[in-house]
Amino acid sequence: MKKIWVILFVIFFFVGFAVTQESQSQHTVYVECGALWDVKSEKLIPKVRIAVSLPDGKIAAVQPHQPGILLGVASGTIENIDLSKETCLPGLIDTHTHVLLQGDITDVDYDFQLLKESPEYRTIVATVNARRALEYGFTAIRDLETEGAGYADVDVKKAIENGVVPGPRMQVATRALNVTGAYPLEGYAPNVPVPHGVQVVDGPEEARKAVREQILYGADWIKVYADRNYRVREDGVLDDIPTFTMDELRAIVDEAHRERHKVASHAMALHGVHNSVEAGVDSIEHGAYIADEDLKTMVAHDTFYVPTIFVFEYVAQGRAAEGATVWPKMLKIHEDTFRRALKAGVKIAFGTDAGGFAWTENPAQEFSYMVKYGMTPAQAIRAATVSASELLGMQDKIGTIEPGKFADIVAVLGDPLADVRVLEKVDFVMKGGMVYKKP
């Protein structure tokens, strides 16, 4: 009998200890918002309380604020965050960045980064850029290639996920793909070996092998450069030289999709866009000119359009001064394309090409340009939340503020529906229940 009591005591002691430890680890954070912009209903809801459970970092409840009534509490400690003077939104998503790129190439030559900065140095700088992205309010990014730094983006992503450095959620495209002669460092003798900003492939089999290799080493996306050498024709169409053959492009898309990965295409003009859409890519990046027939195909195939407007405005004059006079002409063409895509019902996701301009510039300036080009503020915000999360395949995890999703929350003073520029002044950032910036 005594032996039975000893056994029962040991069982109850350890069960009680486990329960105590579990309750101690549970923590609920209440975010008291002056208003919440519901990106799904497109309504501004006043006085909302968001319950965030830790350590899982997910939203437990979203309810109108009622003093004295605490929702979503299982057990454990409670913390309150007062944002009663602010408007809360889902964490913003930038679907086109380059944390390993230095900025406008008219300020610093592209050669400089590839020839004079080591991948190690660039990776350190990339962690700073990733933190900047987060503090700007971007809790998730899709980083579209390292520009000659190999698989360094995979390690930046890993360091963020392991809590080594702060940064947004990342999907990465590693090295990107192009053909011989289409993405070179120019002006060097043929006998001088110089690095490439991309992985060079020629022929369908090389292309397939490169896709497999990049996925093996951590690529979430495959990126292709589909065109080059731009000119404006007399009829106003932005013309180009396509890089890949259709066989090559189809092989890349087929191999990526077979491996359940998506393909992003840098496609600026007529042929690059058309070939990419016909090959079945998942997103068109930049798309300064897209023919109406290709817009129809994009709608039919659910192909996303990531217009990256701000970077065009940012670099156009500098590139024109260097002799690329096509760039200022692109601006009007780009605006017309954006308006036609919007009218046609193409899915548009927010993306900035940050790194193509200096990271000291706030990527949220893209919102103002999207509105200037024809979107409402509500549509622009949706592009950076709901639509962007769908492009990333993370719509069940991020993009809206609702129970079960990660607590990725930002807040601003003022009403972004009245003035979208307030999104350039995010002063509260939470990612996965952890606060990275507060008023």
Where are these regions (language model features)?
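Histidine/acidic residue-rich metal-binding segments in metalloenzymes
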Residues: 155, 205-226, 230-305, 329-348
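Divalent metal-dependent hydrolysis catalytic cores, especially in the metallo-beta-lactamase
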Residues: 125-151, 166-176, 219-229, 262, ...
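Histidine-rich, glycine-flanked metal-binding segment
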Residues: 36, 41-89, 112
